Amino acid sequence: MAAILHLIYTLTHLGLMFWGLHLFPQSSNIATILLLVVLTGLIYDNLIISLGSLIGEGEVLEFLNKLRFLFHALFTPLLLVIAVELANYAGVEWFANPIVRLITWLITIGLIEFEFRKKYLKLKLESTTFAGTLRYREAESNSLPMAAILTIVLVAVIGIIIWQTLQCPWVFVGALIMFFGSAVPTRLVGPVLGSGVEIVLLLSFLAIEYQM
């Protein structure tokens, strides 16, 4: 059942990517480009989870799953830049300031570097099954994903500012849903819920672009 859900998630992200490509000629901003990058990572993430049982346990699946963690480390902090660029595109004057945008990039690069050095380079994987899926997860996961948490909190704050400017709460709501959905332990629901709420956040980003 979970494998089917992740396949549906894969197709949904693919649909969002086509929507983003459709919106790009109208917007031509960096937010759309980065959204497409993040969507590429999520398509890969869900596809590998959905196909894990077919590929089978072993070095190949472990390597493919290690790439999942790499993409999460590299791409998740980009959500912060996307939110800031959307706020700028929406006409929030404060985010048009080059210094603010530079600081945003520096924070994002710092979060990527932190996640890559502290988590990915020390990553040890173990195989696990859930509801018919086979994937590799962190063998030792005693710390919170601080980079992802900080990213989503900052996106939620920016979402509030966009809400006040455009009278549209979608980014804030999407970030809030992702925050609480991702907080549910994977030992209870596997990655199904966390992958689902990622769709909500990215859909909220595209909805804002469409509205503008």
Language model regions located:
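Internal transmembrane alpha-helix with an interfacial aromatic "cap," most often the third helix
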Residues: 17-24, 40, 44, 48-61, ...
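Membrane-interface interhelical loops and short amphipathic "cap" helices
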Residues: 52-65, 126-134
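Hydrophobic transmembrane alpha-helical segments in integral membrane proteins
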Residues: 1-16
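Membrane-interfacial loop-to-transmembrane alpha-helix junctions, especially the N-terminal start
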Residues: 28-39, 98-102, 165-175
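Juxtamembrane "helix-exit" motif on the non-cytosolic side of transmembrane helices
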Residues: 22-25, 49-58, 116-124, 182-189
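Aromatic-anchored segments of alpha-helical transmembrane domains
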Residues: 40-46, 107-115, 175-187, 203
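C-terminal transmembrane-bundle signature of multipass membrane proteins
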Residues: 76, 151-212
